Swiss-Prot record:
Disulfide bonds: none annotated. The lineage of its organism: Eukaryota, Viridiplantae, Streptophyta, Embryophyta, Tracheophyta. This is Beta-amylase Tri a 17. Optimum pH is 5. Highly active at acidic pH range 4-7. Retains over 80% of maximum activity at 4.0. At higher pH values the activity decreases markedly, with more than 50% of activity lost at pH 8.0. Gene3D superfamilies: Glycosidases.
């Protein structure tokens, strides 16, 4: 029976603090992290996830990598007997929800922007976003002779070379490739650093000269040289109906609007495809899984225009699946999809935001599973309460436990945001331990579950037309039960109050 039940086991990881390595690339919290890892091990956790910041490791100059601090952290993780998910963090820390520290991208890269500010994502008003390089420079050799994609590939190759010990030992099991702000495959359409507040629709971010030239060339090729980038899509904190682009029968439904949205979302898919191809070459043969993260943009999901998703680059409408296209691209690289907001309930959201996190999770997970992917999840906000854990448990096994073998569907893993002393104290720790136990189908910790095979080479390039076939028809998501069949009991005695903590 235990053998059959093991197929229901979902691995649990915990995200390490953003500043586990200091802003001057030193590891100074050895005793604190060692003690915290011990408590995670005692709770039965499978592993941890860590941001490996580009701005720290290659901060001193082109190819002047310094991995020493990360090697010290990885040694502690290895000693604790935990697995490790490493994020190739090519973005800035600072400017997004939960960012408590500021780690910019390398100064020598930003210096290129002093003479060519178009290396950064730009909104229609001309404001630059320095969190991540625009995908418009993916193939532009502007960085001491290298393109952006070459810089990312070289960084990953140096990581593989320097972390060979941990790759060979099976400590590092997952390489999550950062593809945009907050490490997510999206445009920086809702930057808090520029005044965006929830539930603003965000803005299209494609007005740097490189993306603008690309759009003009694409429009001319399509026989419409007169088409320009949108000028009617509003500003960060607008509601959809305030804009000509997103209102009922707005621009987004016209030939011109559809052309723009296809171009905008396809550029993002090609960006991910290109960088994953490099990652696959670098980690070929390693026992690791490649992964990307998709942002959980749950606001304005319940209106036909899905405005906030569209500005982020997810061309998702009621009759078009904007996530299955991404999933199909991932199949080429044997990569997995990591999604967020796994803890959210619709009932916790404000009515004005037209938010539907539960339906969004259902759609995205179903899209990944239909394409045969491993799908993982995270929580968006720090929570310690049974309600949140039970929502995660429901999403981890949507139709519950199967005592005779694999469940109909299950998450490949779940990563909890984020490690803190608060998580490891008193009732919070006790509830978290119970949650881990339930994710493990009450079987206790088992490191042999879901072993990772050596990474195979990416399949031949997939034409964008084949990828886009996944968008329509938009199929109904797989059914999800309302509640989990292995719930965490609520011991918090706070009634219906939701405990929310900063991540």
């Amino acid at each position: 029976m235990a053998g059959n039940m093991l197929a229901n086991y979902v691995q649990v990881y915990v995200m390490l603090p953003l500043d586990v390595v200091s802003v001057d690339n030193k590891f100074e919290k050895g005793d604190e992290i060692r003690a915290q890892l011990k408590k995670l091990t005692e709770a039965g956790v499978d592993g941890v996830m860590i941001d490996v910041w580009w701005g720290l490791v290659e901060g001193k100059g082109p190819k002047a990598y310094d991995w020493s601090a990360y090697k010290q952290v990885f040694d502690l993780v290895h000693e604790a007997g935990l697995k490790l998910q490493a994020i190739m963090s090519f973005h800035q820390c600072g400017g997004n929800v939960g960012d408590v520290v500021n780690i910019p991208i390398p100064q020598w890269v930003r210096d290129v922007g002093a003479t060519d500010p178009d290396i950064f994502y730009t909104n229609r008003g001309g404001t630059r976003n320095i969190e991540y390089l625009t995908l418009g420079v993916d193939d532009q050799p502007l960085f001491h002779g290298r393109t952006a994609v070459q810089m990312y590939a070289d960084y990953m190759a140096s990581f593989r070379e320097n972390m060979k010990k941990f790759l060979d030992a099976g400590t590092i099991v997952d390489i999550e490739v950062g593809l945009g702000p907050a490490g997510e495959m999206r445009y920086p359409s809702y930057p808090q650093s520029q005044g965006w507040v929830f539930p603003g629709i965000g803005e299209f971010i494609c007005y740097d000269k490189y993306l603008e030239a690309d759009f003009k060339a694409a429009a001319a090729k399509a026989g419409h040289p007169e088409w320009e980038l949108p000028d009617d899509a509003g500003e960060y904190n607008d509601t959809p109906e305030k804009t000509q682009f997103f209102k009922d029968n707005g621009t987004y439904l016209t030939e011109k609007g559809k052309f723009f949205l296809s171009w905008y979302s396809n550029k993002l898919i090609k960006h991910g495809d290109k960088i994953l191809d490099e990652a696959n070459k670098v980690f070929l043969g390693c026992r690791v899984q490649l992964a990307i993260k998709i942002s959980g943009i749950h606001w304005w999901y319940r209106v036909p225009n899905h405005a906030a998703e569209l500005t982020a680059g997810y061309y998702n409408l009621d009759d078009r699946d904007g996530y299955r296209t991404i999933a199909r691209m991932l199949t080429r690289h044997h990569a997995s999809m990591n999604f967020t907001c796994a803890e959210m309930r619709d009932s916790e959201q404000s009515e004005e935001a037209k938010s539907a996190p539960e339906e969004l999770v259902q759609q995205v997970l179903s899209a990944g599973w239909r394409e045969g992917l491993h799908v993982a999840c995270e929580n968006a906000l720090g929570r310690y309460d049974a309600t949140a854990y039970n929502t995660i448990l429901r999403n981890a096994r949507p139709k519950g436990i199967n005592k005779n073998g694999p469940p109909e569907h299950k998450l490949f893993g779940f990563t909890y945001l984020r490690l803190s002393n608060e998580l490891l104290e008193g009732q919070n720790y006790a509830t978290f331990q119970t949650f881990v136990e339930k994710m493990h189908a009450n079987l206790g910790h088992d490191p042999s579950v879901d072993p990772v095979a050596p990474l195979e080479r990416s399949k031949p390039e997939m034409p964008i037309e084949m990828i886009l076939k996944a968008a329509q028809p938009k199929l109904e998501p797989f059914p999800f039960d309302k509640n989990t069949d292995l719930p965490v009991k609520d011991h918090t005695d706070v009634g219906d109050e939701v405990l929310v903590a900063p991540v």
